[in-house]
Amino acid sequence: MTTEPATAHRRNPARATRLNRDTVVNAALSFLDRAGWDALTINALAVELGTKGPSLYNHVDSLDDLRHEVRGRVLVEIVGMLHTVSSGRTSEDAILAMAGAYRSYAHHHPGRYAALTRMPFLDDVNRPTIDARELAKPATEAIGVYGLDEDTAFHAGVELWAAMHGFVMLEMTGFMAGIEMDPDIAFTEMVHRFASGLAERR
């Protein structure tokens, strides 16, 4: 009586997954959470998926294409999260909730957040690759209750994003650890001062 080698029935779970653009991008997001932005390559992701690097080119054109797709997904995640946490809240309460969620996302997903910092938001002929007003919509909706017109609310939303992003980057690069300041209190006070000044901009 003969028996088949044990390896005959082994299957790589990742290989059993049917690959398409979505599964490749989802795998890249998980990879970023675990290994970080700099470690993401076509070959490294292929190993993660139990396949060969060239096979991924059936689903993404290049590493740059994959990174742009990943960044788009990260932006969708962040905007969706901001809509969720601001739902049912108004004015400063909504702004504080969004700011806290934004900072938390960056801390919990530093690899994904790097997608916002490591690539330009312009294409090869300097055209924007994102719809900035659509991305700012959660903030502009919360800010709009202060009676600001659409353009002023948008500009204020960009200022809020700049403040949050700048603070997060100081934390992620270790700057905040080197000064005698409670980062939680400092962040909350920064956002509070921003919200308090909105009524004066009408």
Task: Say what each PLM segment does.
Residues 23, 27, 31-65, 69:
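Helix-turn-helix
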Residues 104-145, 169, 173-181:
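Short secondary-structure transition hinges
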Residues 72-97, 127-130, 134-144:
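Amphipathic alpha-helical linker/stalk segments
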Residues 78, 86-89, 95-105, 186-202:
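N-terminal hydrophobic signal/anchor transmembrane helix of membrane proteins
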Residues 123-159, 185-196:
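Amphipathic alpha-helical packing segments from all-alpha helical-bundle domains
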Residues 162-180, 196-202:
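Amphipathic C-terminal alpha-helical segment
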Residues 83-112, 123, 150, 157-160:
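Hydrophobic alpha-helical connector segments
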Residues 1-19, 202:
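N-terminal intrinsically disordered/low-complexity leader segments
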